[in-house]
């Protein structure tokens, strides 16, 4: 990832998030965010697939914890408050996927031991597809919404909007494209509400 991006765009975005009254989550609390995602992702198609067809909370939790810890230096990861009812994780332009060695060093081995070696093939397959699509539509010149999760008990209270709007305003200010992919049909209208356009759809 371009060093200039780290030095300019990421700090700018983090500053916007703090000014909006949101909570930049320190690395030592990323495990708690993984639990929020684990709760929110119940029956999420992609995680069901990662888990071999049936959702496994521990696999989902470990996967999210490893992913967040791997990207923490480059990502903008923030929550609605210190209570961590919901969070968002964005990656700046130039992101082309997590690197293998950092992934393994941040808990990947534990994930493999729990879920079995087949999960590595699934992760690589999905990330290859996701990054190919991202390159097609943005040429990797985008802010990439890697994750938006709100715990089930906190859903329907406007937390997703609270998390999304400051970052979308920042991207408008910087004249930057925002990009994401979702694997759940019911999520499409949510993101369209925030101004995203649907560019790709393939039936599983």
Name what the model sees in each region.
Residues 161, 173-175, 184-201:
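Conserved active-site alpha-helix within GNAT-family acetyltransferase domains
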Residues 73-90:
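Conserved beta-hairpin
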Residues 141-143, 170-183:
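Conserved GNAT acetyl-CoA-binding A-motif
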Residues 54-76:
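Active-site rim helix/loop that mediates acceptor-substrate recognition in acyltransferases
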Residues 147-150, 156-169:
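Conserved acetyl-CoA-binding loop-helix of GNAT-fold acetyltransferases
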Residues 87-149, 155:
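Conserved acyl-donor/pantetheine-binding loop and adjacent beta-alpha core of acyl/acetyltransferases
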Residues 146-155, 179-188, 204:
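Conserved beta-strand-loop-alpha-helix junction that forms the acyl-donor binding cleft
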């Amino acid at each position: 990832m371009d060093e200039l991006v780290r030095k300019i765009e990421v700090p700018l975005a983090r500053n916007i998030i703090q000014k909006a009254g949101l909570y930049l989550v320190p690395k030592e609390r990323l495990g708690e965010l993984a639990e929020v995602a684990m709760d929110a992702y119940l029956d999420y198609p992609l995680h069901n697939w990662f888990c071999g067809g049936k959702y496994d909370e521990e696999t989902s939790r470990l996967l999210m914890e490893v992913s967040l810890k791997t990207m923490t230096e480059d990502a903008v990861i923030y929550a609605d408050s210190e209570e961590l009812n919901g969070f968002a994780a964005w990656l700046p332009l130039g992101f082309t996927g997590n690197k293998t060695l950092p992934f393994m060093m941040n808990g990947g081995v534990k994930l493999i031991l729990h879920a079995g070696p087949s999960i590595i093939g699934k992760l690589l397959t999905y990330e290859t597809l996701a990054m190919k699509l991202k390159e097609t539509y943005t040429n990797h010149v985008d802010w990439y919404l890697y994750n938006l999760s709100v715990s089930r008990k906190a859903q329907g209270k406007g937390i997703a909007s609270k998390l999304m709007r400051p970052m979308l305003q920042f991207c408008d200010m910087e004249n930057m494209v925002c990009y994401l992919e979702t694997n759940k049909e019911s999520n499409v209208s949510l993101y369209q509400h925030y101004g995203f356009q649907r560019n790709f759809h393939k039936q599983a």
